[in-house]
């Protein structure tokens, strides 16, 4: 045979009209006349690279054939039901003949879903258990990544920096098969507005087919890419007009009561973005910080500092409404101990602790009385992936509903026992009170059993209000938005292109946080992971389509020395979710990753200082030393 030429880039795929799914379009108004009538106009291209998940524990699974023609799979997966369906399909079995169990994962970030299906085939053929553990090099070569994107934009704006029209094409490298690409592209379209009201838009999404691995879900799921391009456009507008970037941002923010509808038709009802940005400014005094950097840059000939902020508005829910559901199973034993099972999976994000906290709160018992059992398709079926930052929202509410049902039954037993109305029964501090009389939770559990009252319940939750029209790309895809803001300071060596993050200040809207310690860890971790995507993590494919950066020696994730010496993460205070989420909390897994765009913008700011902030550099992501140095030379050349 003769090898065919490989299609490896987005540009090649577009030229050959090679796509894994049909183009997507989101529009509002007529963009061509709006662009033509705009006082100012810019057009250009931007590229951002992919990113490997680099979970500490690689892909690993164990498949064991059963004695009745069934299959048991223990897997490191975020989506047990997807593995169940995949195995059943490959083996020609009904779903009830395949059980998938997940105790925990050593990280995932979107990269662990369906890979375990192959070992079930091997186990089925061999009629004996088969275990798979991919070495790091094989894992990186065989699995999908964050989608690289090519953006082409044409924006019209007025003299104040107000965007009047935007024609934007977002082309994603989907790889060899569709995988998650269509959904990632949809979410990118839904976040290409970020915090800004865009009166006239045409967003076009292209899912490009190339001869690389099929790219897949990754923390943020298209949101980071969508936000990256609009922030770049905002910066270029500011430089062209000689305005401060933050001033242009504020002039384009969504407002309360007007200019509050997204390009996909959802009203931004919970808008607190200006409040979050103001809180960041009050906390760190951005004006004084910027003056300090100006003084440094005037004195330093080689090293230049940059400062940039990044506001975020990130939608929470799966774009596909059917996925926004969850189940949970709660058992109370006669000694007062509790077992909880739900459809979410634990990958180090603290989901099991948060859901256990919910049940502990309902019963008013200590957390150590609750055991969360391994996620299993045989216990809670038909689950959605633990993804889209919705794990706590969905599974926490399902567990709440199950625990509430049991609590109501137990309260009825207690009311009968104390001869008082059920409304007078109070659960508090591991005890049940009726006035000045009380019994322990375990005593009530035993009494309920004696009274033949069920101490088990299944809970279910479906996210309300959401709907989405895939044909028109309109509706309410998100239950609510999570907001945040960041400011980052970097130093750039203009002789080598090397950069260093010196300080980062982060504020994240977590609603009424279920667990501030966990949430702060998520904020910091997501930020550093986002830094890696935008600065050091570069995927490089050779001319034959072989990945050459397939290990820590060639693929550079951030290390401990890359973390800013000053990194302050804060949870926005006194900001409960206006929607009826679990205890009015908000999701935290994905949104903080986009705060790291402040680092990339700060690098651009440092380069722009070479032109007295009158020009925006041509800089793609990741901002490797080579790219930064090229951008520096390009800016210097334009100034000359």
Segments and roles (model prediction):
Residues 221, 386, 390, 578-591:
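Amphipathic, heptad-repeat alpha-helical segments used for oligomerization and assembly
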Residues 368-374, 558-585:
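Generic long, charged, amphipathic alpha-helical segments
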Residues 135-137, 368-381, 542-562, 619-621:
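Substrate-binding beta-hairpin/strand module that engages nucleic acids
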Residues 511-515:
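Cytochrome P450 core scaffold surrounding the K-helix E-X-X-R motif
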Residues 1-507, 566, 598-611, 628-640:
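Structural alpha/beta core scaffold segments of enzyme domains
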Residues 581-600, 604-611, 616-617:
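C-terminal structured "cap/appendage" subdomains that terminate the fold
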